[in-house]
């Protein structure tokens, strides 16, 4: 739905993409300026609703079944779901947070890997997500190997993060990807 809208609304921007590339989220987003990216994403985020999966995940985080939730989503739905149970986990935006603070991120946190829709910078394009994966390589390796971790947002094969996990996961703690 989002890619279809980008293809319709920004057709002129996508002229130099192949038909196959026009189906690729990262390739399409790379043809939009940040304000256009943010506007199109905000439209979908404003419609997003909490569901039972968000509530269950919030409960797992609150009860320490998961160390951290690492999300590719820009929305705050999980944070809102946590608040329904009077739980207010720290939330971090690693798109703008300095690397020197990464080791201080506690368990029971929600960590936005590609930014937050209300933030200053979003990793949307193929180039920006690859760069972000490289920037977070050590953080991801440390996180997935020191406590149970859950990734949420998409299948993972969509950018360089899946390869990072595949290469660095030792299997000593549970890893979930939903």
Predicted regions and their residues:
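Conserved catalytic-core helix/loop/strand module for nucleotide-ribose chemistry
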Residues: 1-148, 156-159, 163-178
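Extended basic-aromatic, gly/pro-enriched interface segments that bind polyanionic ligands
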Residues: 153
